[in-house]
Amino acid sequence: MSWFSGLLVPKVDERKTAWGERNGQKRPRHANRASGFCAPRYMSCLKNAEPPSPTPAAHTRCPWQDEAFIRRAGPGRGVELGLRSVALGFDDTEVTTPMGTAEVAPDTSPRSGPSCWHRLVQVFQSKQFRSAKLERLYQRYFFQMNQSSLTLLMAVLVLLMAVLLTFHAAPAQPQPAYVALLTCASVLFVVLMVVCNRHSFRQDSMWVVSYVVLGILAAVQVGGALAANPHSPSAGLWCPVFFVYITYTLLPIRMRAAVLSGLGLSTLHLILAWQLNSSDPFLWKQLGANVVLFLCTNAIGVCTHYPAEVSQRQAFQETRGYIQARLHLQHENRQQERLLLSVLPQHVAMEMKEDINTKKEDMMFHKIYIQKHDNVSILFADIEGFTSLASQCTAQELVMTLNELFARFDKLAAENHCLRIKILGDCYYCVSGLPEARADHAHCCVEMGVDMIEAISLVREVTGVNVNMRVGIHSGRVHCGVLGLRKWQFDVWSNDVTLANHMEAGGGRRIHITRATLQYLNGDYEVEPGRGGERNAYLKEQCIETFLILGASQKRKEEKAMLAKLQRTRANSMEGLMPRWVPDRAFSRTKDSKAFRQMGIDDSSKDNRGAQDALNPEDEVDEFLGRAIDARSIDQLRKDHVRRFLLTFQREDLEKKYSRKVDPRFGAYVACALLVFCFICFIQLLVFPYSTLILGIYAAIFLLLLVTVLICAVCSCGSFFPKALQRLSRNIVRSRVHSTAVGIFSVLLVFISAIANMFTCNHTPIRTCAARMLNLTPADVTACHLQQLNYSLGLDAPLCEGTAPTCSFPEYFVGNVLLSLLASSVFLHISSIGKLAMTFILGFTYLVLLLLGPPAAIFDNYDLLLGVHGLASSNETFDGLDCPAVGRVALKYMTPVILLVFALALYLHAQQVESTARLDFLWKLQATGEKEEMEELQAYNRRLLHNILPKDVAAHFLARERRNDELYYQSCECVAVMFASIANFSEFYVELEANNEGVECLRLLNEIIADFDEIISEERFRQLEKIKTIGSTYMAASGLNASTYDQVGRSHITALADYAMRLMEQMKHINEHSFNNFQMKIGLNMGPVVAGVIGARKPQYDIWGNTVNVSSRMDSTGVPDRIQVTTDLYQVLAAKGYQLECRGVVKVKGKGEMTTYFLNGGPSS
């Protein structure tokens, strides 16, 4: 079994957080449930407690049935790791699915009339984020793409001006005013193109340029209507249609401005047509058709602009959400890393995370994280008089006092280049020279000892208790690392560590060192003989020569003075910038500011100021996003990831991911195509004669499109339809290939409706009829001849032979075909190449029919009859031979150019939409990838942290930055505590070359502890919590929180007893397979304890109290291979049927005589 087998959990749901919780709403936690010491408290014996949530009894014990150990809710507490939604909605209150939550089921309830009208009005409103700052970011986000689009539009408009100039000047004498207008417009578009590409071009300038373009287009439209010869309500109708379309699609303006501009251009053309053709008998028919045509064009524009902008805003919002989650995770990871590296050295933590990441196969032995360091100094410090101090205060006050003292020691250790290893009760030990080797490691430990003695003097002064520090130092070799699988604590082992532990018996206020340490001091300190062997049997047995430090090194004094001077200078320079904080009270007997400085309380309070002044999370996200927008290059992104013409990703995996994107608005696209079809039908019925066949074709196409819309709507309407229909709907809507095919099919149906009526019209060339009547060749027939024969424009009756009606205004066929092509732009999910191919195929089909098919006669007849109409309007009569030429290019020759211009605009818009969508996808994918990397890193960190601290304790310290002297503790009413030690392991441990200087002995100890950890991980022992290991002693407890405490059944106590017996069995199994004879002593006790963490910056979870001390004594006074329990525990276990025997009265240090029992077995049943 691999060492991390107990850590890795199969990933069931990708949306799980690193805690193993699902992204979703959690059950609300109520702060008022926690009271007393059951809720975390942050107290200090040097100052008043932080005001907790109002509780009825803040200092009384809280029974566990009150759901203790619940964290107080507050900012930053209990934050899920999924994406946090923020108020980023639109001003029109459009509802979008919050990031990181499940998609909300569509609202299928019937809407009222006002509600439907409100939803419809929302479509025409400009979209805008509620936050002005976010809106500016959004505009910056798409600025480069809009700038590129606007530049291309200028080029298209310059080309369009050239086309209009050619159409006007080619057939007849051009009008100078209109030529000058087109020339000026072309020059202005070129100038605007240059302006758009300047580095100083900004968002405000873009809007100004857009409105200038609209003004120029309106002027060109007016000039074209006035210059038309002959005048006609349908003359040049394609031009305002084109202007309206590009207003919605290629101009970067808001929806409201686009709607107003599109309606304005449409109204302008209608007014001009009405004023210039007021005497035409067919004026109102054509004006009605023009109104429908413009309404359809504006509808297409809205159907294109609205989903494109909403998609862009949602993509931006999603990208921002991913960035927000990434920064949130990054912040949490920094806190995790800080907390993790405060407990484990960096090289150990990184190696553990690497092993979790690589997921190595099971090995015969668990991996051991041990390193050897040869030249280090080990310091052990013990508080002399601690028992007297403990007798004068409660357990909580004692823990708070130790916390503040050890927090000060941690600061001193950092200043003196020492690494704190562990805190064992009132014992503090640290090492200098690891993880980085130092030549002055002995000096560092001695200075650390001097500072510790100075610090304890303040405790002695303010408490009135005679406490001192016993400090012992030894230099030599250590093995450092962690053992086991759970609740890792960095530790050191070696014979030199054992020796250093015995060296602390040097006496109060003195530093006791060995000769090995003295040799590293280079004579910088005065010493005297220590005679350690007289006070400690181990030192006497090992013949260790010891010394006592008399005075500090002069060199070190000078260095410290210089450092203190620099710190004072820096503090003075910051004094005007930061308010000085002074605690409300210290120990009950003093408020001496010097004492505060000596204890380091001022400094520790400053440590948290950075957190207070931290940037607001929302502002941090916006600032990061702004920098990312400024740094990214659209052109470079396209070059690196997207093929130039096809706009497909260069990497196949990206293309596959993109192709799996589902467009939820596909049903709306088909509905827009149905709307365009209806408009085309209205135009055809208004302008052209129709037959029963045409009505049947229109009805069939209408039914096909309507059925398609309904099928697509089934996907969003829940389970009201048959399963087969739902499956068909999902297959269409959720498949890019199928939805593209259906989109092309819909456009094809609309195109058929636009050209179907052409085949029912009269196809007889009017020239042929007139030539027969006038005995002329068809080439010689002119408009004047037709005028003489009383032919006129607008007659529906057949002009020549045949019964088919005459289609007098084929310009509307062109307009309807343009509408059918524009309908393809509504389908935003179809690729630009697909739209280009579809446009060319449909356009080519139409041109073949126009130029080579029977309908060609319709367009030739129209050009002649338009000349007749012009002659009639001029009230002049001409001879057939002297007839003036028609002042315009023939419609069938204009049509290919018009189709080409529209195809170019359609392709540019499709390129813009697809390019934007792909770049948004790319950026969101990158943000998602970075977020996932952060989540993986967070998962690794949390797995490590949860093997160092309990989950709720780790969450407490990750919630916000903690001060060094800040305390986290809980009062627990009834906890069972176990100490299990291998009595003869010290005899087994030897340091020889054959066993790699003792590493192999530690490897076996690691296997033993790992087995114990695997057992405690079993479901039946879920109420147990491993506390720590102390050398070869294993410490565990049960009933430490609400989920594991059983007040009625006391199952947590019996679980610990079962675990103790299970360890005895496991040790026998280990002895059989390792050919050893290890003997275990286990001690059990129960009662109240205080559980908490000492050292907020270097947290170490532990439990304290008389219960813990007695449990330890049950182990130390026990008998090998037996489990010794106290009378309190005996009463609980005996009532449950456990087999126990009375040992008798045992003398226990600090407790006198106690009656104890041996646990022999479980219940008889």
Curated annotation (Swiss-Prot):
It comes from the Eukaryota. GO terms for molecular function: adenylate cyclase activity; ATP binding; calcium- and calmodulin-responsive adenylate cyclase activity; metal ion binding; protein kinase binding; scaffold protein binding. Disruption phenotype: Mutant mice are born at the expected Mendelian rate, present no obvious phenotype and are fertile. Their hearts display a decrease in left ventricular pressure, both at the basal level and after activation of beta-adrenergic receptors. Besides, their hearts show defects in sarcoplasmic Ca(2+) uptake and storage, and decreased levels of protein phosphorylation. Male mice show increased mortality after transversal aortic constriction. In contrast, female mice do not show increased mortality after transversal aortic constriction, and develop less heart hypertrophy and fibrosis than wild-type. Its main location: membrane. It catalyses: ATP = 3',5'-cyclic AMP + diphosphate. The modification Phosphothreonine is found at T916. Mg(2+) 2 binds at D382, I383, D426. Binds 2 magnesium ions per subunit. Is also active with manganese (in vitro). It is found in: Cell membrane; Cell projection, Cilium; Cell projection, Stereocilium. Keywords: ATP-binding, cAMP biosynthesis, Cell membrane, Cell projection, Cilium, Glycoprotein, Lyase, Magnesium, Manganese, Membrane, Metal-binding, Nucleotide-binding, Phosphoprotein, Repeat, Transmembrane, Transmembrane helix. The chain crosses the membrane at residues 150-166, 179-195, 212-228, 237-253, 257-273, 287-303, 671-688, 699-715, 740-756, 817-833, 836-852, 894-910. Phosphorylation by RAF1 increases enzyme activity. Phosphorylation by PKA on Ser-659 inhibits the GNAS-mediated increase in catalytic activity. Phosphorylation by PKC on Ser-553, Ser-659 and Thr-916 inhibits catalytic activity. Disulfide bonds: none annotated. Residues 1-149, 304-670, 911-1165 are cytoplasmic. GO terms for biological process: adenylate cyclase-activating G protein-coupled receptor signaling pathway; cAMP biosynthetic process; cellular response to forskolin; cellular response to vasopressin; intracellular signal transduction; negative regulation of neuron projection development; negative regulation of urine volume; renal water homeostasis. Its cofactor is Mg(2+); Mn(2+). Residues 757-816 are extracellular. The keyword Transport does not apply. The modification Phosphoserine is found at S53, S553, S573, S659. Detected in kidney tubules. Detected in primary bone cells with osteocyte morphology. Detected in heart (at protein level). Highly expressed in heart. Detected in kidney, pancreas acini and ducts. Expressed in cochlear outer and inner hair cells. Weakly detectable in brain, intestine, lung and spleen. InterPro entries: A/G_cyclase (IPR001054), A/G_cyclase_CS (IPR018297), AC_N (IPR032628), Adcy (IPR030672), Adcy_conserved_dom (IPR009398), Nucleotide_cyclase (IPR029787). Part of a complex containing AKAP5, ADCY5, PDE4C and PKD2. Interacts with RAF1. Interacts (via cytoplasmic N-terminus) with GNAS, GNB1 and GNG2. Catalyzes the formation of the signaling molecule cAMP downstream of G protein-coupled receptors. Functions in signaling cascades downstream of beta-adrenergic receptors in the heart and in vascular smooth muscle cells. Functions in signaling cascades downstream of the vasopressin receptor in the kidney and has a role in renal water reabsorption. Functions in signaling cascades downstream of PTH1R and plays a role in regulating renal phosphate excretion. Belongs to the adenylyl cyclase class-4/guanylyl cyclase family. The protein contains two modules with six transmembrane helices each; both are required for catalytic activity. Isolated N-terminal or C-terminal guanylate cyclase domains have no catalytic activity, but when they are brought together, enzyme activity is restored. The active site is at the interface of the two domains. Both contribute substrate-binding residues, but the catalytic metal ions are bound exclusively via the N-terminal guanylate cyclase domain. This is Adenylate cyclase type 6. It comes from Mus musculus (Mouse). The gene is Adcy6.
